[in-house]
Amino acid sequence: MLLSFYFNGLLLVGCLLSWGRSDTEGQCHSFTDLNIHNSIIGTALKVQLLLYTPENPKCAQDLNEDNSTGFQYLNVTRKTVFITHGYRPTGSPPVWIDNIVTKFLDIQDFNVILVDWNRGATTVLYHNAAAKTRKVADILKRLIDNMLSQGATLDSIYMVGVSLGAHISGFVGKMYNGSIGRITGLDPAGPLFNGKPPEERLHYTDAQFVDVVHTDTDGLGYKESLGHIDFYPNGGTDQPGCPKTILSGSEYFKCDHQRSVFLYIASLTNNGDLVGFPCKSYRDYRIGNCTNCKEFLPLSCPVFGFYADKWKDHLVKKNPPGTKAFFDTAAKDPFCIFHYYLDIMTWSSQTRRGYITIRLMSLNGNVTESKLDKDHATFEQYKEVSLLAKFDQDLDPMTRISVTFTTGSVIGPKFKLRVLRMRLRPLTNTNRPILCRYDFVLLENVEMEFNPIPCEDTNL
């Protein structure tokens, strides 16, 4: 009898606590998870606007117009980030969504709105997904209009778009005459958008600041520049660590395209290691023609990713706007490569062609070896050759340097390279001293190790 009374009492308390509470209160929403069957039959457009804030970092609230409970978490005085994905041929959620939301909330009190249009983007027919992009933009405009009516400002709107999502972001920006704060395009989709006029794709006039990264220009991405600044990591194609043959399956098709997202996520925490060097072409960058960052003083060359807006004032005033910047990356997260230029002037009377390997050493014994351009260099008397050297470690202070010269030949005589001056210029950390070594001889295939010294005249 007492036990029955106890359980009945618990039931009554539970009913009283739940009485008056809506069905949706406290409910967490998740990104739409579909499959290849949905892709084959096609999906009608249905958009979820999943809100994450410091108050609900793990429990998304849907901001659909018929759902008022989600708006209690939306603080319009904060900056709002819209993250919009692209084409989803298999229907599965993007693997990066949880990570990018978490990283944004770790660095600042944002409203993060994940634009889930998986129902619409999931189809085997890419053009069907592309045809829905303007409808998604219309839905986003209705939400932004609602936010503006509650006190939000267009300055506080930041749109991050992936592939088709980049063009969706551009369409939203056009409806506000380019007044929204910022758009970042992560490898904007190329198919059906290449060669289109500005009103039919992302363009630098769509926001106060538009920055773009291109990682798959020979495949799924857009090749030409679109923003106030366009970054081309590894030249915009063939990203390190991505499969080179179709034998790798689906990764072969999507890895380069998707790398743009992972580079951007890394930039949220790196805060400065992925430095882009303005240049006309990737080749010019590789041969050392693009090291002058004086136009950005007192800043360095622009940093790729989230912190690129620090260079906004320098970039938007260009007439016409449009800066291409290049940098190289490692194959894995955090993707950082530390760049130097190795300048060599020789006084050998005969021209020599060969390869240079350089190793840097620190006081505690750490060693990092250069990843130099694969092309051989031609060393002519009194002509300086600049080689781009890339290292996967940042050694500071650097105590010793070793250099090896080789022609790559396994037969024939061994050559000497008489060096008048060798200069190592830091590009990633430009505040560090330029290091030199003067008047020495490199014997072919013999490693020469020495202590570097500050250059006597860095203007030489």
Curated annotation (Swiss-Prot):
Superkingdom, taxonomy of origin: Eukaryota
Record has Ribonucleoprotein as a keyword: no
Record key words, sorted: Cell membrane, Disulfide bond, Glycoprotein, Hydrolase, Lipid degradation, Lipid metabolism, Membrane, Secreted, Signal
Primary localisation category: secreted
E.C. designation(s): 3.1.1.-
InterPro entries, per database record: AB_hydrolase_fold (IPR029058), Lipase (IPR013818), Lipase_LIPH (IPR016272), Lipase_N (IPR033906), TAG_lipase (IPR000734)
Membrane topology type: Peripheral membrane protein
GO molecular function: carboxylic ester hydrolase activity; phospholipase activity
Lipid metabolism listed as a keyword: yes
Any one Gene Ontology cellular component term annotated for this protein: extracellular space
Annotated catalysed reactions: 1-hexadecanoyl-2-(9Z-octadecenoyl)-sn-glycero-3-phosphate + H2O = 2-(9Z-octadecenoyl)-sn-glycero-3-phosphate + hexadecanoate + H(+)
Gene Ontology biological process terms, A to Z: lipid catabolic process
UniProt-listed Pfam families: Lipase
Compartments reported by the entry: Secreted; Cell membrane
Cystines in this chain: C242-C255, C279-C290, C293-C301, C436-C455
Active site: residue positions: S163 (nucleophile), D187 (charge relay system), H257 (charge relay system)
Residues listed as glycosylation sites in the UniProt record: N67, N75, N177, N289, N366
Family: Belongs to the AB hydrolase superfamily. Lipase family.
Function field: Hydrolyzes specifically phosphatidic acid (PA) to produce 2-acyl lysophosphatidic acid (LPA; a potent bioactive lipid mediator) and fatty acid. Does not hydrolyze other phospholipids, like phosphatidylserine (PS), phosphatidylcholine (PC) and phosphatidylethanolamine (PE) or triacylglycerol (TG).
UniProt-recorded name of the protein: Lipase member H-B
Encoding gene per record: liph-b
